[in-house]
């Protein structure tokens, strides 16, 4: 295809015209500045005008692919008070955080959370070793503004976000707690989409997005993501699912049947949990074998059906729980970084480490399991981001630094005994 470029020609004028032209430019610049100031003032007043604040549907990742999070925000002209449906290191679900914000004219009218607020900037930072994090934004361009709805676009990643005013009677803590309860109840990883009684496809659930994996005739695998945001009732898709020309957008969570039921008028659809067959194969008793020859017999129990397992034991009198996740892609089990217990009031964390060296405080770290033998079932674990990290370290952080338990889990192997 040929590309056609149109170039504008700048004509020259005589010096005698300079004074007149400068006057015209001054008039134009003043008018442009006035429009910019008016836009800033309008956006600022509308932000402040929602007495009980706004619901910001904050989507992350390129094209919003990682899904949405609910952030409530109230603006007073200088400060913004935020609360969210997720917890961070320093804030619980619904706990308020205050920081500065500004509305200014740059490349259009922009909203910037320019002082640190953990509830927003959490999404804009790398999450650990070789991990880019959620690829979120903290600077946005206003695309449309009204008292009923504000549309923003992230400056860096270009994701479109929607803000709507909260009704005066909305209790922030209650709303966010209700949403968090749905998140907790529905966080299974294997589902199937059923429309008009017919199964359309199997779907994975990865945090706040569904995934559909397909393998073509050459063996090439493609994964499509369908992001959504949790609501007090269930979920709302970022963009509707489309099946045979029918758009499917809103779902209510049925906890008794572990099913998302579509609430769109005239649509018969649901997203129903199913337990992958391979999950059940890992329940049972194991020998936990370490590099130093130590062998501990433990039971791997169901924690969340189809998703996770728990292994419980004690160290120095402290109850410890290792959570293993079922990996449907590899049909094996993985060990993620996690909080495994509490020691003297401090959270005990599992992180990857190097023998005689450092450890990585990487909350996204995963020790991926692989089957080394089938009889008996033997599973070995490797830190996927850096295979030289053969330690699973248990550490806790006090005000004067990090401390670790004397027990180090090196070259961990699980051997099934029943």
Give the ranges of each region predicted by the language model.
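Bacterial N-terminal signal peptides that target proteins for export
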Residues: 1-8
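C-terminal motif of bacterial Sec signal peptides marking the signal peptidase cleavage site
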Residues: 16-19
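Acidic/polar, low-complexity intrinsically disordered N-terminal segments immediately downstream
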Residues: 21-110, 168-191, 283-285, 411-418
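Edge beta-strand at a domain terminus
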Residues: 21-32, 146-189, 197, 262-282, ...
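N-terminal glycine/threonine-rich, aromatic-flanked beta-hairpin/loop signature
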Residues: 62-108, 196-234, 294-341, 389-390
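Long, acidic/polar, low-complexity amphipathic helices and coiled-coil-like
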Residues: 79-225
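An anionic, turn-rich surface loop/hairpin at beta-sheet edges
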Residues: 112-135, 233-248, 342-371
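Acidic, serine/threonine- and glycine-rich low-complexity intrinsically disordered segments
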Residues: 167-314
């Amino acid at each position: 295809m040929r590309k056609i470029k149109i170039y504008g020609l700048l004509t020259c004028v005589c010096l005698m015209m300079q004074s007149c032209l400068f006057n015209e430019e001054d008039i134009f610049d003043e008018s442009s500045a006035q429009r910019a100031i008016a836009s800033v003032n309008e956006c600022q007043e509308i932000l402040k005008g929602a007495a009980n604040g706004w619901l910001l549907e904050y989507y992350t990742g390129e094209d919003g692919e990682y899904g949405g999070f609910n952030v409530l925000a109230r603006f007073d002209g200088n400060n913004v008070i935020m609360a969210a449906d997720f917890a961070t290191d320093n804030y619980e679900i619904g706990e308020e955080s205050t920081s500065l914000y500004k509305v200014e004219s740059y490349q259009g009218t922009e909203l910037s959370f320019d002082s640190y607020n953990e509830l927003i900037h959490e999404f804009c930072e790398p999450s650990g070793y070789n991990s880019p994090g959620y690829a979120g934004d903290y600077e946005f361009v206003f695309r449309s503004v009204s008292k009923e709805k504000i549309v923003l676009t992230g400056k860096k990643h270009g994701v479109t976000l929607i803000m709507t005013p909260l009704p005066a009677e909305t209790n922030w803590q209650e709303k966010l707690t209700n949403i968090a309860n749905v998140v907790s109840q529905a966080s299974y990883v294997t589902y199937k989409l059923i429309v008009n009684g017919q199964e359309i496809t199997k779907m994975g659930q990865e945090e706040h997005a569904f995934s559909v994996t397909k393998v073509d005739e050459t063996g090439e695998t493609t994964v499509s993501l369908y992001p959504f945001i949790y609501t007090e009732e269930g979920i709302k898709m970022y963009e509707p699912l489309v099946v045979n020309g029918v758009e499917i957008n809103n779902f209510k969570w049925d906890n008794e049947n572990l099913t998302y039921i579509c609430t769109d008028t005239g649509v018969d659809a649901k997203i129903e949990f199913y337990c992958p067959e391979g999950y059940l194969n890992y329940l049972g008793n194991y020998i936990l074998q370490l590099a130093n020859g130590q062998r501990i017999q433990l039971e791997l129990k169901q924690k969340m059906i189809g998703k996770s397992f728990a292994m419980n034991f004690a160290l120095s009198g402290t109850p410890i729980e290792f959570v293993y996740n079922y990996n449907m892609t590899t049909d094996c089990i993985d060990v993620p970084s996690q909080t495994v217990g509490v020691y003297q009031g401090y959270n005990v964390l599992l992180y990857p480490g190097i023998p005689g060296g450092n450890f990585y405080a990487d909350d996204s770290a995963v020790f991926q399991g692989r089957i080394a033998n089938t009889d008996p079932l033997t599973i070995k674990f490797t830190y996927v981001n850096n295979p030289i990290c053969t330690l699973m370290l248990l550490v806790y952080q006090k005000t004067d630094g990090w401390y670790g338990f004397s027990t180090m889990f090196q070259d961990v192997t699980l051997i099934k005994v029943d």
